[in-house]
Amino acid sequence: MLPRLVATDLDGTLLRGDGTLDDRSRRAIATAEAAGAVVVFCTARPARWLKPLAEATGHHGLAICANGAVLWDLHSESVVAATPLEPAIARELVALLGAEVPGGAWAVERTGGFGHEPEYIPRWPVPDGTTIDVVDALVEQPAVKLMLRHNRLSADALLSVAREVGGHLAEFSHSNSADGLLEISAAGVSKATALARLCDERGIDGQDVIAFGDMPNDLPMLTWAGYAVAVANAHPDVIAAADEVTASNEEAGVARVLERLFTG
């Protein structure tokens, strides 16, 4: 039986290293949708980064953003649902992690904008109206994602420390092994929980879902889905958890699997 829903991560999975989508992958997505499958982008990205991709693919359904904290309508460009990290929890996490791994810099992602400490160096363009302030001020409002960047620790190292000292407070992940960036969401929030909620609303069983990913933030989704596919360039933990390893993101790995399934 063909999958009823295709859930795919974007950066490092569906998209090439330069952030673009190749024609083969674009056609494969269209083929899956034409066959009746629901395609859902599941990403750590904020919603504001998705418009060009939606235009390039012609995909105007729903997207799961901010590692599951936001369900976004690509057609109306609006928030369907959001599960933010509350200020009291964010303050506690800042204190705990600041004591364990001093020297980092903080940033927050909200449904309506972005903010960061002066010491935080964004790797990507920030939106107009970005708030630059001390972390105590940044966490006064709920945030869909809290981020800690550290120049001397790897993302894996940050993840290990965070889970040890704050695992009872929030969800921790990262989406880029080459960047010392820890991503923090409210407790119980992940790509998997958002995807499960979406599937439940549509009457789709998890066993009828195929999921693609490359990084630790994809692991909950991959272990929840009926069939999990890692791209060849994936983190070792992701490869170990996958049912199948396809070609890399530079070699249209996602498209190869979709072609096999939906075109025979």
Q: What do these predicted ranges mean?
A:
Residues 25, 50-54, 158, 162, ...:
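Hydrophobic packing residues within well-ordered alpha-helices of enzyme cores
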Residues 1-5, 21-22, 185-264:
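Mg2+-dependent phosphoryl-transfer enzymes with acidic/Ser/Thr/Gly-rich catalytic loops
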Residues 9:
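Active-site residues of response regulator receiver
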Residues 57-59, 66-67, 168, 224-225, ...:
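Short, structured coil segments at secondary-structure junctions
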